[in-house]
């Protein structure tokens, strides 16, 4: 028989997701319906991603916002442009403040990214295109690249 320690004074460090939400969503389908007839070729996708972190007024509560923009083009048309700001509110519980930057820049975005990816796939499909399935993102590599750029 095992027992579970419910004493919160010695609670294990963890990240709590308090909320997830769409802050802003825009989809443009500027060349429809002509562009929908030209779907026999694979479009070129230009993708950009940015992460914004805001320390909320409460202690150890942060908003982590993913800003994702994708533009699809073929030889003739700009097929679509989608912009999504998707955020989560995170509480870093019993975690040393020195670890906050990497957790907020790597682990928190990785937790909410699948939801943002699904929204983009659904919206592009609803616009008449194949769903845009964004490849998984290595937030750790992005963080380390950004840190090395700041040091130079």
From Swiss-Prot:
Coiled coil: none annotated. InterPro entries: SecB (IPR003708), SecB-like_sf (IPR035958). The keyword Coiled coil does not apply. GO terms for molecular function: unfolded protein binding. GO terms for biological process: protein folding; protein tetramerization; protein transport. One of its GO terms (cellular component) is cytoplasm. It holds the Pfam family SecB. The keyword Translocase does not apply. It is found in: Cytoplasm. It comes from the Bacteria. Keywords: Chaperone, Cytoplasm, Protein transport, Translocation, Transport. SUPFAM superfamilies: SecB-like. Homotetramer, a dimer of dimers. One homotetramer interacts with 1 SecA dimer. Belongs to the SecB family. NCBIfam families: PRK05751.1-3, secB. One of the proteins required for the normal export of preproteins out of the cell cytoplasm. It is a molecular chaperone that binds to a subset of precursor proteins, maintaining them in a translocation-competent state. It also specifically binds to its receptor SecA. This is Protein-export protein SecB. It comes from Rickettsia prowazekii (strain Madrid E).
């Amino acid at each position: 028989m095992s027992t579970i320690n419910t004493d919160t004074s010695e609670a294990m460090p963890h990240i709590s997701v308090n909320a997830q939400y769409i802050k802003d969503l825009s989809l443009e389908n500027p060349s429809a319906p002509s562009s929908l007839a030209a779907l026999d070729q694979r479009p070129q996708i230009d993708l950009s991603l940015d992460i914004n972190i805001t320390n909320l007024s409460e202690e150890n509560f942060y908003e982590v916002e993913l800003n994702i923009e994708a533009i699809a083009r073929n030889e003739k048309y700009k097929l679509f442009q989608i912009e999504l700001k998707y955020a989560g509110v995170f509480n870093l519980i019993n975690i040393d403040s020195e670890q906050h930057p990497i957790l907020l820049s790597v682990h928190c975005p990785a937790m909410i990214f699948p939801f943002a990816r699904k929204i983009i796939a659904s919206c592009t499909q609803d616009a008449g295109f194949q769903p845009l399935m964004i490849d998984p993102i290595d937030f750790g590599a992005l963080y380390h690249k950004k840190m090395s750029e700041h040091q130079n």
